[in-house]
Every structure is written in C-alpha cells, then in structure tokens.
C-alpha cells in the first residue's frame, strides 16, 4: 500500500524497513489475537493526517488553544456517531486507551482507599480491574470476584456475598478473557442493593454491541468504558459512555484536566471514521460473522479433543485449556507462531502454571473475519492448530508446522489485506 508517507520514509531506512516487514507479517500470517484487528485504509489515512499537528486541550467549543474549529468538527462527529451506535447521551472520546478510560472513571467516582470490586485477572478480567501491580490495585481497596470452578462462569452468588460484606462504591464487570455473556441485570441488582455504582468495561465486545449481537450495557450500567480497536475495528484508543448526567460531568473533568492534557486529535479523527463505518449495515454482518467464526473454531478444536474453557463462546474469543494435551501456553504460542498462526498464551481459571508460562491460549476472530474468513476457513484454522499442537514435542513437529505454514500462506493469498481487493 505505497503512498506519500511511505515514500517519505525512504529517508529513514530503520523505520521504513520495520514498517515494511510488519506489513509483510500481517499480510502473510493469520492473526488470532483477540484484541487485534485490521483497520480500514480510511482509518489509517485519518490517523496519519495533519490532525496530529493540532493541540486542542479542552472540549469542542471550549478549548484552551486557538485554531480548533476543524478539530472541533472531528471530535463532535466522533461523539455523535458513538452516541448513535450505543444509545448514549454522553460520550467522551478523548481517552488515549482503555486503561486511561478506566482510570478516569476511578478518578471520577472513587477516592484513594475506597473499595471497589472487579473480575479477577485469573478469572478473565483485566489488569485495570484491581490487579495488585496496577494503580487500581495500589490506590484502592480492590476486592476481586471470580468464576465457578465447575463451569468457569462468573460466580454471581460469590459476587453478591462479597458486595454485601465489603460495601463497595463501584462494581466493575467485563474482561479480557471471558468468552460468555455477562448477566448485567444481575450485577445491576447487586450494585443497587449495596449502593454501588456499576461500570462495564466492554473493550472486547464493543463491536458486538455496535453490531447488535450482544446486549448493550449502556442501557443498564451507570458508566461504560471501551477501547476503540479490537472488535470495533478502529484505532488504538479509549472511550467513555453514560446516560447519567451527574456521572458525565465528573468524567469530563476526570479525563481533562484530571488525567490527560491535550487529546490526540489524529486518533480521534480515526475513531470518528471507524465509528462511521460501524454505523453501516455491513458492520452488523461483520459482527454476526465474528461470533459465528468463534463458535466454528471452538467446535473444530473440541472435535480434536481440546478443552474449551466454559464449553464454548458467546463472543469473538475462545480460551483453550491445554492441560489435557500436556502443552503449555508458552510453547503453544511459539509453535503456532512458527506456523504463521499468531495468538497469545493466556492463563485459564485456577491455572497452576505461572503467568509467563500459562496453561492456555486465547484465540480471537476479529482480524481474520476482517480478511473475509467465514466458518469454513475457521474450521480449517482449527484443524491447523490441532495438527501443530498434537505434533509438538514429537519428531513430526517441524513437518506439521511447515505444512501448516503452507496452508496459512494459501489462506492469506485467498483473502489478502491492503490490496486492490481490500
């Protein structure tokens, strides 16, 4: 995809070379990391635009710098489009990331030392939901809830017992490796019973909500955060939504000046483009296909004897428990990488292995679905994964990885990215 900016990079061979090789990697490998996707050329163009030159502290119509009339149009468009997508009366599109969005909510609603609850990282939550090494785990009294060992589904009874015992000011739900629908109404009832606010982090499934294949938490929670990449297929960034005007005022102040200075206007421009794309009818089909593909992949692996955490998926991701195969997540990630299948090692609930090793892998469908993969292709991908991992540690390992790599090459050639067919 050569263009003006690529040509300009010829004067910096180090960066130009790295970008070219990364483009080659993305074109020639099947991306199965659940948090990654393939943005459109329009999103790339917006993020690489002159909007990056503009400082714009403040909000549309209320900036601390002159010359903001055009960035105001861009940010207003992003806000309007997000509000339409998620039925939200208030949207802040300035957070630089999902972690920044979550931090802004905590700054808005909590004081240091306050108690809040979040799904534990070990159960599929996110670092920012109270993991000890993070700001959320150090500045606040973070009480973690988990999943049942019997089925790896959220233990709502445990959540309720802990909420009654600790009286949190905020209950957070959502996660980074939880493949099932969450009972938002049950958590809302628990939060109401103890006087807590409810926050949903929909970073992973925002695109599914936008596409109408997942319940909309904005209708239930006091406040919702998300990233704009992953299933939403936009640039890397964050966003906060609510229909509670009291919360909205606190959030705006928490984002700026509380947590951030100038917003990244080139990224907000790209967010606006991606949100516009998500309003189109074909995005709804894309969302449906992500879920159908994830279920096809889960079924293909189950047929080959692989254990899928929780028994399946309702979303774009699956978590594979490799213990019965005697393979670590680390070794699986490396072997699949050699075969051109990019994924990440991931802890499973009640994982006996350390985080740098893990007993599982996380697989997602957003990027390959953007390439055009459907169920048939994901059935093939599931077979390739099983072939590689079944042979791992045997004398057939190298040959299976080579064969898988050839199949990956053929699939990528049939479904190219950033070409005339994209």
UniProtKB/Swiss-Prot annotation:
Cofactor: pyridoxal 5'-phosphate
Subcellular location, record wording: Cytoplasm
InterPro entries: PyrdxlP-dep_Trfase, PyrdxlP-dep_Trfase_major, PyrdxlP-dep_Trfase_small, Ser_HO-MeTrfase, Ser_HO-MeTrfase-like, Ser_HO-MeTrfase_PLP_BS, SHMT-like_dom
Function: Catalyzes the reversible interconversion of serine and glycine with tetrahydrofolate (THF) serving as the one-carbon carrier. This reaction serves as the major source of one-carbon groups required for the biosynthesis of purines, thymidylate, methionine, and other important biomolecules. Also exhibits THF-independent aldolase activity toward beta-hydroxyamino acids, producing glycine and aldehydes, via a retro-aldol mechanism.
Subunit structure, as described in the record: Homodimer.
PANTHER family: SERINE HYDROXYMETHYLTRANSFERASE, SERINE HYDROXYMETHYLTRANSFERASE 1
Listed name of the protein: Serine hydroxymethyltransferase 2
Protein's organism: Rhizobium meliloti (strain 1021) (Ensifer meliloti)
Name of the gene this protein is made from: glyA2
């Amino acid at each position: 995809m050569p263009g003006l900016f690529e040509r300009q990079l010829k004067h910096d061979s180090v960066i130009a070379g790295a970008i070219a090789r990364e483009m080659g990697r993305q074109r020639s490998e099947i991306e199965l990391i659940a948090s990654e996707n393939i943005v459109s050329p329009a999103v790339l163009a917006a993020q690489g635009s002159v909007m990056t030159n503009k400082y714009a502290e403040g909000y549309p119509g209320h900036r601390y710098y002159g010359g903001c009339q055009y960035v105001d149009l861009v940010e207003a468009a992003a806000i309007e489009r997000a509000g339409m997508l998620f039925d939200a009366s208030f949207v802040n599109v300035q957070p630089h990331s999902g972690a920044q969005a979550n931090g802004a909510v905590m700054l808005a609603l909590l004081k240091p030392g306050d108690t809040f609850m979040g799904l534990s990282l070990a159960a599929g939550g996110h670092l920012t939901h109270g993991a000890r090494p993070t700001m959320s785990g150090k500045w606040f009294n973070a009480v973690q809830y988990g999943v049942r060992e019997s089925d790896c589904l959220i233990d709502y009874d445990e959540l309720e017992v802990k909420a009654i015992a600790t009286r949190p000011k905020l209950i957070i739900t959502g996660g980074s490796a939880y493949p099932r629908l969450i009972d938002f109404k049950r958590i809302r009832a628990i939060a109401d019973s103890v006087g807590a606010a409810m926050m949903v982090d929909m970073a992973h499934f925002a695109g599914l909500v936008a596409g109408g294949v997942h319940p909309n938490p904005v209708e239930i929670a006091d406040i919702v955060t998300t990233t704009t990449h992953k299933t939403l297929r936009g640039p890397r960034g964050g966003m906060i939504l609510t229909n509670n005007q009291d919360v909205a005022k606190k959030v705006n102040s928490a984002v700026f000046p509380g947590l951030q200075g100038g917003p990244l206007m080139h990224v907000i421009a790209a967010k606006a483009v991606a949100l516009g794309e998500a309003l189109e009818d074909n995005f709804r089909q894309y969302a449906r296909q992500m879920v159908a593909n994830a279920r096809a992949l889960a079924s293909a692996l189950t047929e080959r004897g692989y254990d899928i955490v929780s028994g399946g998926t309702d979303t774009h991701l699956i978590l594979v428990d490799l213990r019965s195969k005697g393979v670590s997540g680390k070794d699986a990630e490396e072997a699949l990488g050699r075969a051109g299948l990019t994924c990440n090692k991931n802890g499973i609930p009640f994982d006996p292995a350390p985080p740098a090793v893990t007993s599982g892998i996380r697989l997602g469908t957003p990027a390959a679905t953007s390439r055009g993969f459907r169920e048939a292709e994901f059935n093939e991908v599931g077979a390739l994964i099983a072939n590689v991992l079944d042979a791992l540690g045997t004398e057939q390992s190298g040959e299976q990885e080579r064969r898988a790599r050839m199949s990956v090459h053929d699939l990528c050639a049939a479904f190219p990215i950033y070409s005339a067919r994209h």
